[in-house]
Amino acid sequence: MATTTRRLATEEDLRNTPDDGIYELVDGEIRMSLAGGAHGKTSMALVALLGPHIRQHRLGHVFGPDTGHRLPSGNVRCPDVSFVRAGRFPNEVVPTDWVNLSPDLTVEVVSPSDRLRWILDKVGEYLEAGVPLVWVIDPQKRRATVYRSLVDVRQLGPDDDLEGEDVVPGFRCRLGDLFD
């Protein structure tokens, strides 16, 4: 009986993906993210609020979904929004290639095509990589889940404030403002 061996995708394969979407390298597979309108609107609303706060207070660098972060697991993940504190890049030079460190904040915005298992896998991987704050925002349900660890988890509704806590000091916005 013949067996077939599946070749694991590499970072080189990821570099050679077409420019028609956002791809991640996860456990030797190339995965493409399919985002909808509510996903894009919510992500951009958050960046429009978070970005100026980070720049004004010189807290660090905010990145969009096309930025790959090479995690200790070897996976290259592209959070919808991510933040890296000032002082973490050598000489404060942001790399032109993938970011070779775990963000301080990752944000995943839920899309209709997302499976709960994929989201939880991402959250677990981010936390295991040392990301101190993870937000999962669901525009369809108008809620967010805030993770500091797998046991320190809070649910937020549209009237609750999404806060940067000690990771993005002073940042606060009403969650519902991201959906309106």
Which ranges hold each PLM region?
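Gly/Pro/Ser/Thr-rich low-complexity, intrinsically disordered segments predominantly at protein N-termini
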Residues: M1-D180
